[in-house]
């Protein structure tokens, strides 16, 4: 690991109130002493107590660059567990760059992307899953994603994985000890105990794996396709949910010929709304391509909102759409409830078992019922999180699945009365795989790949 002193701008480079230039490494105080000056020219910062804030100026050969506040943190009580300095300067682009240039001129080098967090990981302050949570916190685009990332940052995934690994290593150690010293340590009856322990570990891993689909939707949003025949009111519904005229609305059927995507936030959930071309038989080549794209989007959706014009009788297009959504997560909306309805809910019920709601995109009625129904369809209506952690990282999910497969092989070996050393092979394989999640058994290339995704200064 590189132990030289690094520096970078930790905030977005723009005209703002303040910017932060971060320094970390064993020469951090030597660097700041060269460029920081107080009005009274009092003691150097290297002589000050840790976790204190100091007012003064950043200078370059006696020329004042900026008026700043400097925070000093001595190792190991810092983010990187190294001597660290944070310079709060004015937020202009030019002045921030000049401050960084002074820091580099004084002996620091520019940090690589994610190098501060990488040092926090390599120095043992956080594990690899927590390091990955840092970037998830930064990129979180909704409240639930932020809450889940913070739980991971606090070590929830770490603790669950460590508990399973601890159980595995205890069983492995006992087997190895018994094989080395059979006169004093007996394996008689151990298979039953091992089976119970492994089944418990498989259950723990399965529970984590089963959260990954909801985890994906928390992180990326619920892919929600608005489907229906032309002029059913799909674009009006999109505009209503988005809160602005995002899609063109006319009385001419087939106005929307391509998908339109927008993101809305609903009770902490992120919905990626997709307005699609109306579904109908058509000879128009462009419209036909739009219909095909609509159906493709619907097949990939987490949720389909099927919009039916309640002011006109059901036609064959409506019936085919209802058949299409039969085995998918969907809601049926009877739109244009402001007009006289000619469709009976009982007839719709015969064609689908999906929730049916009345709505008027024009009068903006029924939207609250729609929002409540969507909330209830995901996370069992409970999105307060409590103590649950959702797996949002595909690397973590794949490792959990691989570890589970190895543990299931242990059960197979027990049932087939295989020699005990066979148990150890699969147990240790699961142990090592789980170690890749928290960084206890991971190669350098993977670590470097993960941290390259970070921004400069983090």
Curated annotation (Swiss-Prot):
GO terms for molecular function: GTP binding; GTPase activity; metal ion binding. Its EC number is 3.6.-.-. It is an enzyme of class 3 (hydrolase). It is found in: Cytoplasm. Mg(2+) binds at residues 235, 256. InterPro entries: G_TrmE (IPR031168), GTP-bd (IPR006073), GTP-bd_TrmE_N (IPR018948), GTPase_MnmE (IPR004520), MnmE_dom2 (IPR027368), MnmE_helical (IPR025867), P-loop_NTPase (IPR027417), Small_GTP-bd (IPR005225). Residues 221-379 form the TrmE-type G domain. Pfam families: MMR_HSR1, MnmE_helical, TrmE_N. Keywords: Cytoplasm, GTP-binding, Hydrolase, Magnesium, Metal-binding, Nucleotide-binding, Potassium, tRNA processing. It comes from the Bacteria. GO terms for cellular component: cytosol. The keyword Ligase does not apply. Its main location: cytoplasm. (6S)-5-formyl-5,6,7,8-tetrahydrofolate binds at residues 22, 86, 125, 458. The keyword Metal-binding applies. Exhibits a very high intrinsic GTPase hydrolysis rate. Involved in the addition of a carboxymethylaminomethyl (cmnm) group at the wobble position (U34) of certain tRNAs, forming tRNA-cmnm(5)s(2)U34. Homodimer. Heterotetramer of two MnmE and two MnmG subunits. Belongs to the TRAFAC class TrmE-Era-EngA-EngB-Septin-like GTPase superfamily. TrmE GTPase family. PANTHER family: TRNA MODIFICATION GTPASE GTPBP3 (PTHR42714), TRNA MODIFICATION GTPASE GTPBP3, MITOCHONDRIAL (PTHR42714:SF2). This is tRNA modification GTPase MnmE. It comes from Lachnoclostridium phytofermentans (strain ATCC 700394 / DSM 18823 / ISDg).
